């Protein structure tokens, strides 16, 4: 198997932007003394048979040169690793080629902007370079096992005893305290209607105690392996604001495939603290209203398999059900009992209606883009000109 490890890494153009509310959970400061990426790459040096690493460098266009220089400094400090760096410069060439292949269906669906589009850019780069398996890893994670790649590719591309193909699988992460479970210490009215911890932990405990490979209701985007038979046929959704990893599970099920869980494949997750929570909550509001609208639309398409809340219990079923009234309640109480009063109050007053409008206007957008995806992948596969661009030989 010719696998590659794909790592999206998020950078700010300056210190002021690093902690500003924005599209991504965190962005590394340009002058950070101990950047997450350096720690992640250092952990990969111990891995046996580590393949090519593709770094997707996400940053403002105006900061591309400075960020590229900083990232290359970090990469040069790990000479035993084979790293292909993809900045806005290389990504724009791939996006241009995608637009030529599918002029009516691409837009920014394959780019370094937006979680789903960034994942698609990783898949596009893998296709250009001829890799038949992609292992996604996040830059705020560290690998804790020298057999990481052996575990990553275990059973991938094979079948279960029932003859079901294992084309996508997820591992899981340990937090700072060494636990694979979601913390249950956040209680009180601010979390009363907006917590998935109990349902998630119930599912996770069962998965951890079962066979090594089991059918999954969960995806850890920072530890996810995809075979080419999946990623050349099913794209990530570039229209979802966050949660593109779990959404990929829904997409796979729509097309009649399963995602699998490997309870022996792990990393350690060490995310930086988030300074503001209301922007992330707003993204989640958009996410869940859009998800419900998209799945409802897809359920009416004859050629697709309906994805229902009942089939995703105990988690994440409730989040795609009609229980989304929890959004308004949560926004209201957080506007009263947190320091981010203005942010949550704006969500309560306007954000929910805006999210509903977005969901209604885009319920068919993913399937429209997805119809072009197999052709995009076929045309990109081992593209000689793009290969020379990515490998710096053009």
Residue ranges: model-predicted function:
Residues 1-49, 54-66, 392:
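N-proximal low-complexity "stem/linker" segments adjacent to membrane-targeting elements
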Residues 68-125, 129:
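Active-site-proximal specificity loops/subdomain of glycosyltransferases
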Residues 131-145:
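Short beta-strand-to-loop acidic/aromatic patch adjacent to the donor-nucleotide binding site
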Residues 144-168:
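Conserved donor-nucleotide/metal-binding helix-loop-beta segment in metal-dependent transferases, i.e.
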Residues 163-187:
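Short beta-strand-to-loop element that shapes/binds the nucleotide-sugar donor at the catalytic cleft/hinge
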Residues 205-225:
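A recurrent flexible, glycine/aromatic-enriched loop bordering the glycosyltransferase active site
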Residues 241-248:
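Acidic donor-binding loop at a coil-to-helix junction in glycosyltransferase catalytic cores
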Residues 283-394:
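Terminal low-complexity segments of carbohydrate-biosynthetic enzymes
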């Amino acid at each position: 198997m010719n696998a590659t490890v794909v790592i999206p890494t998020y950078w700010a153009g300056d210190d002021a932007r690093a902690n500003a509310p924005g599209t991504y959970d965190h962005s590394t400061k340009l002058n950070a003394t101990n950047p997450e990426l350096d720690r992640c790459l250092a952990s990969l040096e111990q891995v046996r048979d580590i393949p090519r690493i593709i770094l997707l460098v996400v940053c403002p266009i105006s900061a591309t040169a400075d960020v590229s220089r900083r990232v290359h400094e970090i990469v040069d400090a790990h000479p035993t690793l084979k790293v292909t760096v993809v900045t806005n410069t290389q990504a724009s060439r791939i996006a241009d080629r995608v637009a030529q292949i599918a002029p009516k269906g691409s837009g920014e669906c394959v780019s370094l902007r937006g979680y789903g589009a960034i994942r698609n850019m990783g898949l596009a780069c893998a296709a250009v370079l001829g890799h038949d398996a992609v292992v996604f890893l996040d830059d705020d994670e560290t690998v804790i096992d020298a057999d990481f790649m052996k575990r990553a590719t275990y059973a991938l591309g094979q079948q279960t005893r029932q003859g079901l193909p294992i084309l996508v699988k997820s591992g899981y992460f340990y937090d700072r305290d060494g636990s694979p479970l979601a913390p249950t210490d956040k209680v009180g009215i601010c979390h009363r209607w907006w917590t998935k911890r109990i349902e998630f932990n119930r599912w996770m405990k069962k998965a951890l105690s079962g066979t090594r490979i089991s059918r999954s209701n969960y995806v850890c985007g920072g530890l996810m392996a995809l075979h080419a038979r999946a990623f050349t046929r099913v794209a990530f959704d570039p229209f979802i604001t966050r949660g593109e990893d779990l959404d990929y599970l829904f997409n796979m099920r729509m097309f009649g495939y399963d995602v699998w869980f490997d309870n022996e494949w792990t990393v350690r997750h060490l995310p930086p603290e988030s300074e503001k929570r209301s922007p992330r909550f707003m993204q989640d509001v958009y996410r869940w209203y859009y998800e419900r609208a998209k799945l409802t639309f897809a359920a009416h398409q004859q050629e697709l398999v309906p994805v229902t809340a009942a089939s995703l219990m105990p988690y994440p079923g409730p989040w795609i059900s009609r229980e989304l009234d929890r959004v308004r309640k949560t926004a209201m109480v957080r506007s009263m009992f947190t320091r981010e009063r203005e942010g949550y109050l704006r969500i309560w007053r306007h954000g929910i209606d805006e999210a509903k409008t977005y969901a209604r206007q885009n319920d068919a957008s993913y399937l429209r883009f997805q119809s072009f995806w197999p052709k995009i992948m076929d045309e990109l596969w081992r593209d000689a000109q793009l290969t020379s661009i990515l490998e710096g030989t053009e």
